[in-house]
Amino acid sequence: MLTGDESLKKRPMKPILNSLETLGISTESDDGKPPITIKGKINGSEINIDGGISSQFISALLIIGPRLENGLTLNVNGNLVSKPYVDLTLAIMKEFGVETNTEIPYEKYSVEHQIYKPTTFTIPSDFSNLALLLAANVLLDDGLEIDINLGEMPQGDEAIIDILEELGVTVILDGDNITTKSPKVLGGGRFDLSNTPDLLPALAILCLKSSKPIEIFNVKHARYKETDRISVISRELKKIGIGVKENDDGMILTPTKNHTPAEFNSENDHRLFMAFSIASMYIGDCTVTDPDSVQVSYPNFIKDMKNCGAQIIPL
């Protein structure tokens, strides 16, 4: 049986459960959500899966493919979201000695029965979390110099650099350090996050310093994360005075000069807690719920923010 914390129990898993059942596995779940019971032995070699909800399903199936007796042919139906994460999966599999045949990019893959081989692998800095630190740097007057290890793995969330530059920020990469030089007021723009949904929280809070609307679109799959991030971000930013038009696949954020201190409800979502905490540091006198959620991805977040001068007081 597989389960998780309360936020993970909200995540829809039906696409991958349906695929596993195609391979002969029996599954039981709470309407496609954890806890999930898995029984049986895989006896198939070709499956179809919906690519429109999460690329994580495709990554998981690709990773098990080499260990199946007859290998695996994977057909991705619909428009695959978060494509760079599939590229990253394939690159890491190759590092460990597994070759994958990309028959049609982002639509059809096949992998023969193979054995993963031990290797030495340096994990690069995670741009999903780095994006939040860069957003903090922009909002808090560029006081941070962040040590990083970029590595050579493809990371879609590296797009945060292009996004910041479109908003008027200069991003400075100097060896293993990254910092920013920001204008007093940011610009606005339209941003397609179809391949980078984890950038949504970082981009959304940058509207606190913008002078023009920020439109975020093609990120409907962010509704299927630990929370419905489009809905929660829209609701919470309204509390501080941001004009929000929530769309099915994103939002339009209209900035204000006067921000109202508020209590942010992060709904136990680690990325939202971090984003709302950074927004609170900019506004002042705010409260953010669920600090323990950062244990999922960035356990030292609060400590690091305090080291940067943030006044964070547990309640």
Across the structure, where does each feature detected by a protein language model lie?
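Short, structured segments at the rim of ligand-binding sites
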Residues: M1-L315
